[in-house]
C-alpha cells in the first residue's frame, strides 16, 4: 500500500529471494486477493468437492491414477485455517467459483447434447491458455 516505505519493500523482496522464491511481484492488496482466490482457494474448493462427491464405501482408491491424485492432493487440509481463508476472501472466491461454474456447465451441456465439436473447442482453448502460463 502507499503506507509502505520503499526500503522496507526492498528488504522483504530481498528476504523472499534469499528464501528461494523466484518470482516476486508487487501488487495491490485487492489484486492479490483476487489472484489468490483463483490460483489457490478455487483449486482447494475443487479438490474438496471432487473428493466429497465420491460414493462412500466404494474402493475408489483401487482405481485412481495420477490425475485424481494430482487433483485431490490438496483436499487434505487444515479445516480451521482454510475455513477462515475462504470466508475472509469470500467476495473474490465466490466470483471465481461462479466463473468456474459457468465453464463447468458449458462442458456439461456439450456432453448432454453430444456436441463433440464444442467439447473439442473447449479443450483446444484450455490447451492454448495453459501453454501461456
Q: Where does each model-flagged region fall?
A:
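Amphipathic alpha-helical coiled-coil segments
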Residues: 132-133
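Interdomain hinge/lid region at the active-site interface
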Residues: 59-129
Amino acid at each position: 500500500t502507499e503506507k509502505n516505505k520503499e526500503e522496507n519493500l526492498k528488504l522483504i523482496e530481498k528476504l523472499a529471494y534469499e528464501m528461494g522464491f523466484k518470482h516476486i511481484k508487487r501488487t495491490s492488496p485487492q489484486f492479490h486477493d483476487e489472484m489468490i482466490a483463483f490460483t489457490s482457494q478455487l483449486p482447494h474448493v475443487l479438490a474438496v468437492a471432487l473428493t466429497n462427491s465420491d460414493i462412500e464405501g466404494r474402493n475408489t482408491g483401487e482405481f485412481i491414477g495420477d490425475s485424481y491424485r494430482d487433483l485431490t492432493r490438496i483436499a487434505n487440509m487444515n479445516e480451521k485455517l482454510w475455513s477462515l481463508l475462504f470466508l475472509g476472501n469470500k467476495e473474490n472466491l465466490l466470483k471465481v467459483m461462479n466463473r468456474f461454474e459457468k465453464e463447468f456447465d458449458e462442458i456439461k451441456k456439450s456432453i448432454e447434447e453430444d456436441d463433440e465439436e464444442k467439447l473439442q473447442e473447449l479443450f483446444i482453448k484450455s490447451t492454448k491458455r495453459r501453454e501461456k502460463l
